[in-house]
Structure formats: structure tokens, C-alpha cells
């Protein structure tokens, strides 16, 4: 369903006639009908905002935070977010229909640093590709989630295009990793925001440029704002073959350590206790991870959502053929409130040695590429009902 196939004037007409769930959530996209590309460099960003694209409701505005970090604000009539092209293509301050959906943190703007924990306020981080997560005992050190979170991109661009889903604003670029005699690969993500939509479509091309096979790990860390009463629905069976709690151990007997240790034991016995957010009875201080191995629909897509008490839901879907796992990450400390509803991943929340031992690396032969695809956004009540029905069908309920 994510493949590009077909073109012509009838494409948009066909999309308008397709079933609502398929059109709104997982519309089959045809060939790109047109795209006007606007390249930019770091010199475009200053204290005075510059509008790089303005086409109806689709806008892209370059500016620079007082911390010196370059930001590109992209928006349509219902959605707004800031992409950091030279800081890992991180996505900050996402709003849909005026609702802030980004994790609560102590960071009111991105800081000019490459240390993960000193700048952890974004909605979205690309992670990998040599490693993911953090190094475990006995492993050589590597940065938290490796090089992608703070990668400096080249060939950066924005622009407006048309495909069978309609008109969209795109932002993208390419990061090239070179390590003499070892690694040579490129990672090229693109974000697409369509007119009138609260759904963002993303893809990332991984290209092995070396004459030897490339083994890579990948993860996309999307951090939503926690909402008490939020209820999780997901296309992973609730059994030990598909769900694994990773209890947090702080290594001491402080009240904080004891509280999360005890909660971790309860979750390990019954992971469904985490399926409805409740800050009065649950402990996610400092954080907790639950690993899920997802089942997919007929198109290879995994689905996960958090239904909101007031109606609607936060939603994530992705092509699980290259990323069969997803982490549910929870951090609710009072100062922070972040929930990774589904963090698509090639493997689990463990270090790289564990991933290798369990066969979680993807492999690309010389010159080959993979395309990773995923979507995230805000669903209304009808769309939420359709998504839940899709999940039920996958699980045979």
C-alpha cells in the first residue's frame, strides 16, 4: 500500500472515491504528479523568519532559535511542527487542530548540543543506523541511539507536490556516514504534510554505498504527550511471544528505585496493566519500556493508537516488513510526561550486541537500498473506530 504505482489525472478522482479508512489513514499513493523543490542551506536561517514556501495553506518558514539552532516551521490549515534540518531532522512542537501532542519536558526550545539527554524535548528522533538504544556492559561505547539523532544533513529541501492523496508540503535531506575501511551509507528521510490533514506521512531511504554488505539497526522515537485515561490499542497479540516488559532497575534502594522496581514486577506478570494510562497507580519515573512484536494487515502494516478520553486518538502505522518490533516507552515523572505509543524498530530496547545475537539487524548488499515508511497523526472518533476495527481484524477478534 505504500508503493508508488500509477499516474494520471484520474488518480485524485479515484482517491476521493476510496473507503474513508483507506483514504484517510493508509491511502494507496500513486506516482508523484508534480513536485516543486526549494533547496536551502544553513545560511537561510536567521533571527528574522524567511518564508521559503507559501502555497495556499501549505507554508514552510525558516528561522533560528536564540540558542542558534536552525528550525523550519511547516504547516497546513490543521497541523504545525518544526523540523530541525541540521540537528538530526528532529521534529519539535507538533500540534494538530490546535492540540499540542508533544511530550512535556524541561526544554522550551532545542539546545545546541549533541548529547541526547541534554536536549530531550523533541516529538520525533531518527535513531541508528550502526547502533540503537544505549551500550550495555561489555559493549564498546556509542552515543545514545547512535549518530542519527544529531546528524547534520546535506541536500536539504522543502517544496510543494501533488500525488493521488492530494497536495502536500515536503521536507527532506540526506545524511552520509563514512568510516574508513568499515562503513559508507546514506540515510534520506522525507516528511510530507498534506492539505487539510492531521496525518503526517514519512519515509526514509537507507542506501549502502560501500562494496560490502551493510548491517543496520533503525528506530523512530515519537514522543507523545501522556493523557490520563488514554487507552492503547495495538496489532500485537497479548502473549509472551509478542510482549516483553523491560523493567527499569536503578541499582539502589531509594524510594524512587523501589517504586519502579515493584511496578515493573507487576507489569512483567500482566503487561495489560499498562494499557490505560493512570498516573495515580502507575510508576514511570524515570522511564519504562515494553517491547511488542506486531502482526500486520494484508499490506504489511502494523497499527497502534492511544484513544483519548475526550474522543479521537493519537495514531501510528508503519511498514513492519523492515521494522517488525515497536517499543512502548513511558516517562511520567511530573517534570516530564512522554509516551512512545509505538516506536517502530528493527529490534527491541536492548543494546547492539543483543540485537546481533537475536538476528535483529537488517542487511543490505552493496549498492542496495531499503525504504522505511510510517505515518503518525491525530484521528477523529470515526477514524479511530475504523482503526480499532482494523486492529481487531488483524488479531482475529
Locations of the language-model features?
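Surface-exposed acidic/polar loop and edge beta-strand patches at domain peripheries
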Residues: 2-195, 199-201, 212-215, 222-397
Amino acid at each position: 500500500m505504500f508503493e508508488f504505482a500509477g499516474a494520471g489525472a484520474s488518480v485524485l478522482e479515484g482517491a476521493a472515491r476510496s473507503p474513508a479508512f483507506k483514504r484517510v489513514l493508509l491511502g494507496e499513493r500513486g506516482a508523484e504528479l508534480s513536485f516543486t523543490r526549494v533547496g536551502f542551506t544553513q545560511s537561510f536561517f536567521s533571527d528574522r523568519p524567511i518564508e521559503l514556501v507559501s502555497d495556499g495553506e501549505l507554508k514552510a518558514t525558516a528561522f533560528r532559535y536564540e540558542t542558534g539552532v536552525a528550525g523550519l516551521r511547516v504547516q497546513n490549515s490543521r497541523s504545525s511542527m518544526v523540523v530541525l534540518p541540521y540537528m538530526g531532522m528532529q521534529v519539535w512542537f507538533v500540534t494538530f487542530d490546535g492540540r499540542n501532542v508533544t511530550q512535556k519536558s524541561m526544554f522550551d526550545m532545542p539546545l545546541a548540543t549533541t548529547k541526547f539527554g541534554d536536549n530531550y524535548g523533541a516529538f520525533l528522533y531518527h535513531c541508528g543506523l550502526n547502533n540503537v538504544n544505549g551500550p550495555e556492559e561489555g559493549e564498546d561505547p556509542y552515543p545514545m541511539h547512535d549518530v542519527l539523532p544529531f546528524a547534520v544533513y546535506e541536500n536539504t529541501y522543502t517544496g510543494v507536490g501533488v500525488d493521488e492523496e492530494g497536495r502536500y508540503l515536503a521536507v527532506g535531506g540526506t545524511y552520509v556516514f563514512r568510516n574508513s575501511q568499515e562503513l559508507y551509507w546514506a540515510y534520506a528521510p522525507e516528511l510530507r504534510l498534506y492539505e487539510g490533514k492531521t496525518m503526517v506521512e514519512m519515509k526514509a531511504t537507507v542506501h549502502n554505498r560501500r562494496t560490502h554488505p551493510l548491517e543496520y539497526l533503525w528506530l523512530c522515537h515519537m514522543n507523545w504527550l501522556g493523557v490520563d485515561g488514554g487507552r492503547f490499542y495495538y496489532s500485537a497479540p497479548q502473549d509472551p511471544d509478542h510482549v516483553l516488559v523491560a523493567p527499569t532497575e536503578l541499582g539502589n534502594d531509594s524510594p524512587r528505585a523501589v517504586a519502579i522496581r515493584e511496578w515493573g514486577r507487576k507489569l512483567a506478570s500482566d503487561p495489560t496493566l499498562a494499557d490505560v494510562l493512570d498516573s495515580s497507580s502507575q510508576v514511570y519515573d524515570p522511564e519504562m519500556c515494553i517491547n511488542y512484536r506486531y502482526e500486520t494487515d494484508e499490506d504489511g502494516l502494523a497499527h497502534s493508537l492511544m484513544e483519548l478520553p475526550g474522543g479521537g486518538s493519537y495514531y501510528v502505522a508503519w511498514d513492519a516488513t523492515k521494522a517488525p518490533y515497536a517499543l512502548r516507552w513511558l516517562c511520567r515523572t511530573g517534570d516530564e510526561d512522554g509516551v512512545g505509543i509505538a516506536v517502530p524498530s528493527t529490534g527491541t530496547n536492548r543494546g547492539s550486541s543483543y540485537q546481533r545475537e537475536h538476528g535483529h539487524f537488517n542487511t543490505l548488499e552493496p549498492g542496495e537500498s531499503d525504504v522505511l515508511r510510517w505515518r503518525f497523526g491525530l484521528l477523529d472518533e470515526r477514524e479511530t473506530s475504523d482503526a480499532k476495527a482494523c486492529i481487531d481484524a488483524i488479531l482475529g477478534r
